[in-house]
C-alpha cells in the first residue's frame, strides 16, 4: 500500500515548509486516487485529437514535479517508462518533495528560484498546475466510462472498502 492511500497525518507544527509539504501530501493523495486501477486501455483515452490523453497528463505531471525537484535538488531523476512505473515514480517523486519541503526553514525556502523567480510562483504555478491536471485525469476517466473511486480529499480517507 502506498503512503498516499490515505492522507498522511497533519504536521504537528505550522511552518512555511510544512504548509508546502501538506500541499504536496494532498497532491499525492489526489494523484493516487485519480490514477488508481487505471487500465492501459483507458489511459490512452482523449476526448479529441487536440486534447492530452490521461497518460499524457500523467507524463506532464511528472515533468512539472521534476521541474520543482530540480529547483531544490541538483540531481536529476529519470522519467519512468510505461504507465504503471510512471504512476509509481510520480508518487515517489511527490513523497521526496514532500519530505524535502517539510524540513525547510524560511531562509531555505526564500532561496529557491524557479525560472529566476522567488519562491511564490512555485505555489501559483507548477503546484497549482499539477492539481489542475489531476482534475483533468479524473474528468477524462469519467468521460471514458471508468470514473475514479470515491475517496474523501477533505478527510484524506480512501473509498469505502479500499
Predicted regions: what they are:
Residues 2-8, 21-32, 42-80, 115-162:
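Short, contiguous alpha-helical
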Residues 67-100:
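Helix-adjacent hinge/juxtasegments
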Residues 9-13:
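Short glycine/proline-rich turn/loop motifs
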Residues 14-21, 80-84:
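Second-shell loop/turn segments in exported
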Residues 36-42, 103-104:
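Extracellular-facing binding/remodeling surfaces
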Residues 22-33, 90-100:
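An acidic intrinsically disordered interaction segment
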Residues 98-102, 160-162:
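Long, well-ordered core segments of solenoidal/helical folds
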Residues 101-116:
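Acidic catalytic patch
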